[in-house]
Amino acid sequence: YQMFDEKNDFNLASFREHIQSVLTEQDSIVILFNAPAHNPTGYTPSDETWDEIIRVLKECAVSGKKITFFLDIAYIDFAGDSDKARQFLPKFGHMPDNILTVVGFSASKGFTFYGLRTGAMLCITQNPEIAAEFKRVASFSSRASWSNTARAGQAAIAKVFRDPQLLQKVFEERKEYEDLLSRRCRAFKEAAEEAGLTTCPFNAGFFVTIPLSTKNSKKTEFSPSLSAEEFELRSPLSVKPHAVWFRRKSLRR
């Protein structure tokens, strides 16, 4: 479906149309939805938009049809205030039985060790029988597909949560990167507006998307108003690999 409409808002009409189109041909659909801090746009739905998305799902889940809504929250820990970024999740706790919400979580990103590729998958449902079935199916399919996540990542997460002081240290370190990304986000927005550069709506995370348009294609150069020194907030040697990558992208013209 088309993600944004002509007003640069989430395109609910296209979202609904494509779900209904698929469900006229078959009885079930799996929807993959990456938010908040969507990759690659950095878009986060507003509270009202989440309500509208849920309303569309319920409207489309007519009798005899099943919807699995896979919510990829990989970048939720870099989507602004941690508590506010999670406030939308309870909205999915009141779905009918024919709508199953599955949440994919990335410990690798949330705990700043990308290379270990550690994550988890859980479901949100009011029905204990559906939850039990999900656990059985997920356990069987994961063992048959990739067996398990990296042991080193699992061990690291377990160690962090056994030690309150270490956990607090991790949160503080991650907060530094959150603040770093937030400042870069604001700087890029200001520079883009100054240069007349159109972007897809974004407000958090690692990414921004510049759509191909007549307006943007006429731009021959985009020069951020901030200097390299203002972006250089710490030595590259002391920054995690993903932060170094973002720094390089931020300074590229």
Segments (PLM) and residue ranges:
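PLP-dependent class I/II
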Residues: 1-253
